[in-house]
UniProtKB/Swiss-Prot annotation:
One GO cellular component term: extracellular region
Keyword Signal attributed: yes
Propiece residue ranges: 18-19
Signal peptide limits: 1-17
Lineage: Eukaryota, Metazoa, Cnidaria, Anthozoa, Hexacorallia
Compartmental location: Secreted; Nematocyst
Record protein name field: Small cysteine-rich protein
Originating species: Anemonia viridis
Length: 64
């Protein structure tokens, strides 16, 4: 996924984003496209999910 700072979010740009996998650029960044290829027991975070830390892949753990 690609994560960007909230103030840089442009909804139209989000929909045009070709990248499917990337890490967050900074703490507090936001996922702006869905991930493919997340590891087992993880799923693609929803759009605008807040990244926990630099390098977060935007794959979220499955619960339950």
């Amino acid at each position: 996924f690609v994560c960007v700072q909230a103030r840089q979010i442009d909804p139209e740009q989000i929909l045009r984003t070709p990248e499917k996998r990337a890490s967050c650029s900074s703490r507090g960044g936001i996922c702006r496209s869905t991930s493919i290829g997340c590891p087992r027991r993880y799923h693609s975070c929803h759009l605008f999910h807040h990244c926990r830390s630099h390098g977060d892949s935007c794959c979220c753990p499955n619960y339950g």
